[in-house]
Structures are given as structure tokens and as C-alpha cells.
């Protein structure tokens, strides 16, 4: 068994941010077609969803994708996308824990639960502009209507026998799942979307080339300023495997997702499609861990969406490296192929972390990317809670925007963090806390770490050094709890990523 990664994670250090290229110019990367997973086709189109729902939305509320309104000479941004696997693919998902779950979230979680650990899907339909959230039973029926239509189009022999909502609700079919993002409290314009589906599902329209994937990523966008898509390719055993990831998000970002078990808008959506031969149950466990340390560790504004969804598909179509040796198992499982699964899980986790960073960098009005690393806590959950509290503090975020090394705000937000219980009980010890600002990795200047608090005691701060450190777009904050009440037994750590609050955030959200 051997293993090699073909792509490495790059760093973008840019200072001062005012002199940088646009986010789209910096973060939209050319996709190498050879790194796209085998056995997937995508399509996208403009259905006019925003225009269709505009009469029932507030004129003062920016519709989803306000920042992406096309110039009169430009083609409108696509707002519906379809991803299709050539064979039924293993499926895994994590979903918002918001009580007001949107209709597509309810549909997906119900379908996956009914299908059990061997769930399979053929396609993912996604729309932007309307969240289909807080729309009651009618919202569920609208989702099912569109899912049924896509399923029928992908199975031409069944086009004359499309099941009714009641019939499909009794089945455990997960052939098609749907994701939605946009304005809350407004019904999907089903007719507008439905009339595009035959076009989207046409063999002549479904494509696998990079431009098609990029357009699909654009269809996911709401207040995003650039499409977010990355690929990874690696060899596992005798298979050359690939993963493509698409996600979106810029506002209403503070996910806390788990597996299935007013005029606000925006959300976090993501799809990761791989050709690796991974079973559904194993894929779910890999996705759970990847999301735990990536998407569940970011925040833009502290607001959890009704629609947050990450889906992962695995269709097993990865090509063999050695064509004379094709006896690789159909699907890898943790019990029978632990090395393969562990290496795949690391690739998925690394890609999820990279994709989650793109959401933070594209946060509404964001001018700073802030990493908060909390270490030497009692448990991971406690370190995560403290890092989250710091990252969501409006005062901390404003200080980062003002390039102010305000350790007091960091300390304050750490002190009121809501800590999960542990046995024995663990508490933060104020006399042990260290707060240090670190220079960004690969920065061109010879900068040293800047301690602002040591053992709970404020330090004299070199303001010139502080200003230089915080003038970077990327700011790194290290909070060492030195074990707290557990002393040397407190060794857990967590990393969170957030952005600053700028005047532009208020403008976008007004």
C-alpha cells in the first residue's frame, strides 16, 4: 500500500489588504481537469429565482446575491445547479441543529434516516435565492416535487409515472437530495425551477469539465463574492482517487452541524464528491470528523442558519493505477481497510478545512482572517467553546478590524464562555492564562511573537510591533490555558477561524 498527495495547501499573505487584488482574483483557482473525480457530471442555469420571489420580499432587505447583480451586458449568475453521479453513490451528510430546519434539510435527513447505513444517491439539486425555510408542509411538498422531477428525468423510463408527494413520502428512496439557500420565509418558485430541470438533466448539457464545475459553484452563491471550489488527488492502494469540493457562505455563518438524527438569508452549503470506493457508513464517520474540525470551527457573524448542509458522495469510480491488478475491494470499510480509510479521512479533513477558510475569507465585509488557537484546556469541547466565544465576540472582531492588540477583550470573552461539563470538573484558572499574537506563517518580515498576557499578568506591549503584526490580513491569536484547574492533565486544544467586523458588514446587512 502506498500513498501520495499531488496537491498541497498554499498560504495567502497579503498586506496591507487595501493594496491587494480582489478576493475573486486571489482565491478563484484554475482547476486541473485531471484532478476532477470520475463518474460525475454537472450543469447549472439561471431560473430567475430572486426575481420570482421579489414581490413578496421587503424592498429594504437585500435579496440573496445582492453583491452579484449582473451588469446589464453580463449574463445573469446561475441560480440552480445539478450534480449527477453515473452510478448510485454512497452518501453522507451533516445538517444544521437550528430548530427551524428548512424543508430541504428535513427532506434530506428523513430520507437518509429511512435509507439506513447503505444509503445511495444519484444527484444533488441546489438552488440559491430562496431558502425554502419556515414554509411549513407546503415547503416540504415543493422540495419533493422538484426532487421527483429530477429523479424522473434521470430515469427516462419513469417519466410517465412520477410519484405523488404522498407516495414518495412512504418510500425510502434517496435517489435525489436538494439543498437551498437564500431568503427565509418565502416559498420556492417551483414553476421557475421546474421549467429548467429538463435542460439541466439533458445529456448534452451535463458536463464534467472544469468550467462546468465552476459555473455550478457560482450557482451556489448568495452574498458570496467568488465561487468556492477546490480539488484533491491522491493514490490509495491501486486507485487514483480525487475529491472535488464546492461550498458557499458569507453571512449567517456559525455552523453547528451534525448527522441526520423575518427576511433573513444566507447559509453554509457544501458538497464533496469523490470517486474513492468508500461505504456510506464509513463516509459518514469520515465526514463527521472532518466537519467537526473545519466547518464547525468557523464563524462570520455568530448566526446559525436554518439550512446549513454538507453532503459527501462516493461513487467508487476511481481508476486503477496498475491495470494488471484490479482486485481492489468494491468499497473500503474501517474494519477491513483501516489504512485506506484513515488516509482518505485525512484528505477529506484537509480539504474541508481549506474550504471552510474560504468562507471566512469571504465573510460579508471581512478584511481580516483571524485564527484563534486555544490550547491546554481540559477537553477538546472546552477548548472549542472558549475559542468560539472569543471568535464570536463583537468587541474582539472590532478590535481586529482596528488592528488593536486588545487582549482584554480576548480575556473577557474567554471568561464568559459556556463550558460543557466534564468529569472531574474543569475550570479556567485566570492566573495561568497566556495571550500571544503570532506572526503569520511565511510572512516576509522578521517578526517575533507578541505576548500581551503571561500567567494572567498584562505585559508591556511594543505598540510598533503590535501595529505591524495586526496590519497583516491574517491575524493569529494563541491562548494558552496551561491546563487550568487540571494542571498538567489539561492538554486539549482547538482552533477556530473568524473574521473582523467592518463598516461594510453593516452596509451588506442593512
From Swiss-Prot:
Biological process (GO) annotations held by this record are: L-arginine biosynthetic process; ornithine biosynthetic process
**What keywords sit in the KW lines?**
Acyltransferase, Amino-acid biosynthesis, Arginine biosynthesis, Autocatalytic cleavage, Mitochondrion, Multifunctional enzyme, Transferase
Q: What GO cellular component term, any one, is given?
A: mitochondrial matrix
Q: Which SUPFAM superfamilies match?
A: DmpA/ArgJ-like
Catalyses: N(2)-acetyl-L-ornithine + L-glutamate = N-acetyl-L-glutamate + L-ornithine; L-glutamate + acetyl-CoA = N-acetyl-L-glutamate + CoA + H(+)
Q: Where is this site: Involved in the stabilization of negative charge on the oxyanion by the formation of the oxyanion hole?
A: 181-182
EC numbers listed for it are 2.3.1.35, 2.3.1.1
Query: Any idea what this protein is called?
Result: Arginine biosynthesis bifunctional protein ArgJ, mitochondrial
**Species of origin:** Malassezia globosa (strain ATCC MYA-4612 / CBS 7966) (Dandruff-associated fungus)
